[in-house]
Amino acid sequence: DALILSPTQLEIRFAEEVPLELLSRYFTNLQEDYYGESIGRIIFNSKEEDPVYLLNDETKQVFTVARPANLLQSLAELYESQKEAYAEVESYETELAISYLPIEAITIQKLVYLVEKPSNSYFIDLLFDDTTDLKDNGSDEFVSYSDNISELSIDKETGQLSYYRNILDAEDLPDYRLIRDSFHEIKMLDNWTNPFYFYGFDKENDNVYYRRYVNGYPIFGEVDYGLTRIRMSGSSMTELQFLTQVIQTPLTDRGEDVTLLSGQDLLAALNAGGYSSQEIQMIALGYDWTFSEESNRLVNLTPKWFIKIDGVWKALDQWIGGTETEADDSGF
């Protein structure tokens, strides 16, 4: 914690702890012994002679690596080119990590998009080796197909896809290999054109999670449409859940500004709702994905505070039963 809170330094933070093997292309010679180690933060200070620090919040491990030449100059240029995207923050200690929250209330625009999805045949061709003997198990609510070892279903209204495949005698692989192989599967199947990032690994059942992003912010929701779950057995995928619909055309005339609580007021609201900072695992500013009442081809992306407690992500208004839309109306 002392290293994280040291002054005059810059920090890059990942959404979740990332195995070093997945970052190996950034190292000159990363030894295989370190492949399974994970980090959640990269820290470097203003002294050019000091190393770069790689940190794991959960285990409190700190790794050091040699600093690349002219690192600060490159980062200074990046900052100067995007000054308007930054806000002054204050550090807060939560259950799992130190979080940075804005000192003042912040304003972000609500987005409205037209959405599209590939045809069902696109996923059928990708997920089934042989389509000649498929059984059509469809209903009014779902498109559904199966063969002797796998089953696919797609919700007709939302486009949520679920897939299961039975695989026996899979090779036992280290965690970082499962994560890496799952990424290749997602890249092949998902036609999301905006960024998506690794968002966690469940060691108990080999589930790998990814989350979609827009404008640098993660997508959540009461139904978590931003989350992709993939389960690996060896190097093969056995389960998959994700949203086939993707944002396509922004309707800029429907956008509107939403003002969110400052960090201090956010924590005060949670505390008043019965949640102490030591119960809070993570806090993120993100978009709440909801389908428009006009049409399921229209999606509202509303900026909100999202909080992870007991392993579950929910919006602030879900945790405390109130509203967080306008900071001025929050009572703080």
Per-range role (PLM):
Residues 235-259:
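Short helix-loop boundary/capping segments
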